[in-house]
Amino acid sequence: AGNRRPIWIMGHMVNAIGQIDEFVNLGANSIETDVSFDDNANPEYTYHGIPCDSGRNCKKYENFNDFLKGLRSATTPGNSKYQEKLVLVVFDLKTGSLYDNQANDAGKKWAKNLLQHYWNNGNNGGRAYIVLSIPDLNHYPLIKGFKDQLTKDGHPELMDKVGHDFSGNDDISDVGKAYKKAGITGHIWQSDGITNSLPRGLSRVNAAVANRDSANGFINKVYYWTVDKRSTTRDALDAGVDGIMTNYPDVITDVLNEAAYKKKFRVATYDDNPWVTFNK
């Protein structure tokens, strides 16, 4: 059992502080949080809005910085709200409201907020790994803005905790080109998926997994969204994904406990580096 693939069970659309405990207690070791921006490219709310997955309340939200503080409590050892299992947070950056030329600025403002309210200015802040998930390949300058700001503020080492994802279901080769432009190698998750009310095949997941497992691929980890059924969970695990985003973490947990899957997979812990490609 020593060489089982670590799996990140990603609680989907966790936008209110109270939902952090709710999803982790159901088995999530990772959460996905939506971030909306104001007209000046400041991250404003953790908010998804309508439409969203069927069966979910689309309108729960917090002020962004309040959410970061709540998340920090949940991921700081010794805090009364600490959840040891929560090790990865995917921020789904809703940059569609921004002009392309605001992307770099959005990255800078993002980094400032995260540094202050989540990382506590580098002084015993939250420990979770962070994925910046960007829906538009043209918004790759956000990554540089983010990195530049952390460096300027004296904490370039925090980039060790940061990974990347382009979530627009673009052609894998186009995603690779965007990372080249952004100067990013490594720490790359690749998402693929669709809202839970629509079916989607696994052909692009298979392409992402093939890239991840090839000698010259750029992808480190692959996740699939939004998976709410046992059958789809099994299909995704069979395809070799590293993460499954879900509205029902307990469903994914149940499948991982089935005999056939228990042998090959386990729930990732803090000791599993989410930027390292798993070797079968």
From Swiss-Prot:
Location in or out of the cell? Secreted
The job of this chain, per UniProt, is described as: Dermonecrotic toxins cleave the phosphodiester linkage between the phosphate and headgroup of certain phospholipids (sphingolipid and lysolipid substrates), forming an alcohol (often choline) and a cyclic phosphate. This toxin acts on sphingomyelin (SM). It may also act on ceramide phosphoethanolamine (CPE), lysophosphatidylcholine (LPC) and lysophosphatidylethanolamine (LPE), but not on lysophosphatidylserine (LPS), and lysophosphatidylglycerol (LPG). It acts by transphosphatidylation, releasing exclusively cyclic phosphate products as second products.
Cofactor info, note text: Binds 1 Mg(2+) ion per subunit.
Q: What is this protein called?
A: Dermonecrotic toxin LgSicTox-alphaIA1
GO annotation, cellular component aspect: extracellular region
Chain positions recorded as Mg(2+) binding sites: E32, D34, D92
* Claim: Ion transport is one of the keywords in the record: no
**GO MF entries:** lyase activity; metal ion binding; phosphoric diester hydrolase activity; toxin activity
Gene3D superfamilies assigned? Phosphatidylinositol (PI) phosphodiesterase
